[in-house]
Amino acid sequence: MYDLTFLLISLFPIDITLPTRQPQNKPFLLPQATYETSHNISDPAVSLHGLKMSISTTETDNFKPVHTLVSSPVTIVLTGSLLFIIFTGFFSFFFCGCLFRKLMRIWNNHRNRNRPSNLIQPSNPPENLGLDSKIIESFPEYPYSVKDHGTDQCSICLTEFMDDDTIRLISTCNHSFHTICIDLWFEGHKTCPVCRRELDVEDRTSLEKPLEVPEIDLVRSEIHDEPLPRDTVTIIVHEEHPSTTIGSLEHTDEIESYERRMKASNLRFWRSHSTGHSIVVKTENEQEEEEEEEKDEIKIRIEISGECQFEDHKMTLPNRKLYCVRGTYSVG
């Protein structure tokens, strides 16, 4: 409001006259002389009184009333016109903005109503950053025992393992964690928390693409006393629990080194007499290999005796591969 008043005053100045002192043309006569002359009084007290009255009369005559100039009608009309233009422009701008937003909202609603529904496609689901649940379940769980395993701690929560804690073992790298901790970790990661080994590549390949090996014929023969060939390899397998899953042979390198020592000393594995049965494995390329040198000929002989169990295992022999996959013997 003060800014508007200042603007109006600066645009339309108002002429205001202030009171001014008007000079007197008539000469100033000494009051005492005039008074004494006119009244013929020589008393000092009377002269002083007459001087005061003369001064007051002179001051009254010197001042005139103040006259101010009132604003003209033209100034009032111009001020009112300016205010009307300002308020009209402001309200017009505000009204046009509201009207434009209303029209845009109506147009968008009309366009969305006429749009075909088949054009609306759902967004792609986010990619799963965690490990597959099948791979997680493939890692074994076991209750922890301080007496058997000693003192150890979980690398995720940094707390020591206590008795009867459920532990999950990552068989790929042999690292153990609390089941709850490692399951939460696998929801957003695919690696081991300790060694950062990628667990998704190898495990997914083994789950989705099982090992394909050709089947071989197992020939069961009755007990016989004829000597075995020098290059025959005999593997002892128990048959005490036929329905039990065949176990795993670890330390493949030790088996191969032991085999080489046996061949160097011209020793052989003799058949087991616990059950009196033996299995001779014959391959399709046996006839071709018989024509080769004797050192390259290998015959695999599997005898069922009744002592050990094997799980999934892969043992490499010279020029041959023996696969023991859950009870199915295969040679590649």
From Swiss-Prot:
PANTHER family registered for this protein in UniProt: RING FINGER DOMAIN-CONTAINING, RING-H2 FINGER PROTEIN ATL81
Keywords attached to this entry: Membrane, Metal-binding, Signal, Transferase, Transmembrane, Transmembrane helix, Ubl conjugation pathway, Zinc, Zinc-finger
UniProt-recorded name of the protein: RING-H2 finger protein ATL81
Organism: Arabidopsis thaliana
Transmembrane region(s): 76-96
Zinc finger intervals, RING-type: 154-196
Pathway assignment: Protein modification; protein ubiquitination
GO (cellular component) term, any one: membrane
